[in-house]
Curated annotation (Swiss-Prot):
Pfam families: Glyco_tran_28_C, Glyco_transf_28. Keywords: Cell cycle, Cell division, Cell inner membrane, Cell membrane, Cell shape, Cell wall biogenesis/degradation, Glycosyltransferase, Membrane, Peptidoglycan synthesis, Transferase. UDP-N-acetyl-alpha-D-glucosamine binds at residues 15-17, 127, 165, 191, 247, 266-271, 292. Pathway: Cell wall biogenesis; peptidoglycan biosynthesis. This is UDP-N-acetylglucosamine--N-acetylmuramyl-(pentapeptide) pyrophosphoryl-undecaprenol N-acetylglucosamine transferase.
Length: 362
């Protein structure tokens, strides 16, 4: 597809929503013979995660400024200039043919440094509302890509979906097994858990189990295991519940589930679509610009999900939605198919193709 020896600098960090899609593209290009290098920050998750995938990573010193104190904001311009110079040094040493920015603090200085060096800059925005870094960089980027329609209003952007792991794409293509009598509910609140799910699910399951057999696989987050387990026991529901601080094998969890209760992060929404699972979405209420609500609307408008704002969520509403899905397995299956229908399954290849094209143009 492309001559071996091409080089790409990938900039993504801070959260899994940035890092994992970037890793999907990096792995794909590495398989094509590309040399991949990463730019990130030393105190965020990319510092630990990226080397595990065999990629070299360089660090620059940059932190976010949005919502911080006055002194930090006054110092920010000087820190930004320093971080741009740090990124410039990395670029001068590595000499990438193209730079890919997928969000996180390092993307801003790295993107500016790339354009100052005359290197093509590709941006990819995972959320339905762009983050501040990508919003600013979109004005100077060579090509802007996004996962959802109407993400950018001031620049022309190509909609390509969110890159996700090939294992999940393959899972979505598998025939769905016959539904068990028990409704299987997967609860995922992120690596830290979601307090609202941990607080409400034990009682909601108790209410639901009066009418319906139900089993639960609940990711409760770090340090929450004992408290949530006790809550399920208090409501007499510990028998059909699998509780874990963190679910390492999401492929197995998605394969097991009939329905997913979760937040509406961009990567989560894209994964639900790819694996073809119906969902109850509770957007994180403190997300910047309420972007999770916009993310979730993609599945809601397709008829593949229910969206419940956390401000109005209570035990009875949650139990009621689960009961509704349990009572109509045919509609549950249709919701799963609608989710799969809106999935963009070649997002990784599309992002890679843009990078390849720009690198070949020089």
């Amino acid at each position: 597809m492309t001559p071996a020896g091409k080089r790409i600098l990938v900039m993504a960090g801070g959260t899994g929503g940035h890092v994992f899609p970037a890793l999907a593209v990096a792995k794909y290009l590495a398989q094509q013979g590309w040399q991949v290098r990463w730019l990130g920050t030393a105190d965020r998750m990319e510092a630990r995660l990226v080397p595990q995938y065999g990629f070299d990573i360089d660090f620059i010193d940059i932190k976010g400024v949005r919502g911080n104190g006055l002194i930090r904001k006054l110092a920010a311009p000087f820190k930004v200039v320093r971080s741009i110079l740090q990124a410039k040094a990395v670029i001068a040493e590595f000499k990438p043919d193209v730079v890919l920015g997928m969000g996180g603090f390092a993307s801003g200085p790295g993107g500016v440094a790339a354009r100052l060096a005359g290197i093509p800059l590709v941006l990819h925005e995972q959320n339905a509302i762009p983050g501040m870094t990508n919003k600013l960089l979109s004005r100077i980027a060579t090509q802007v890509l996004c996962a959802f329609k109407n993400t950018f209003t001031t620049v022309k952007a190509k909609v390509v979906g969110n890159p996700i792991r090939q294992e999940l794409i393959a899972l979505g293509a598998e025939p769905k097994p016959e539904a068990d009598e028990a409704l299987k509910v997967l609860v995922v609140g992120g690596s830290l858990g979601a307090k609202v799910f941990n607080d409400l699910m034990p009682e909601a399951v108790a209410i639901l189990s009066q009418q319906q057999s139900v089993t639960v696989w609940h990711q409760v987050g770090k340090d929450n295991l004992a408290g949530v387990k006790a809550a399920y026991q208090q409501h007499g529901q510990d028998g059909g519940v699998n509780i874990a601080e963190f679910i390492d094998d999401m492929e197995a969890a998605y394969r097991w589930a009939d329905v997913v209760l979760c937040r509406a992060g961009a990567l989560t929404v894209s994964e639900l679509a790819a694996v073809g699972l119906p969902s109850i979405l509770v957007p994180y209420p403190h997300a910047v610009d309420d972007h999770q609500t916009r993310n979730g609307q993609v599945l809601v408008e397709a008829g593949a999900a229910f969206l419940l704002p956390q401000a109005i969520l209570d035990v009875n509403k949650l139990a009621g939605k689960l009961q509704l899905l349990a009572n109509d397995r045919t509609e549950l299956a249709r919701m799963g198919q609608r989710a799969r229908d809106v999935a963009v399954l070649d997002a990784t290849e599309q992002v890679a193709a843009v990078c390849i094209s720009l690198a070949e143009k020089g």
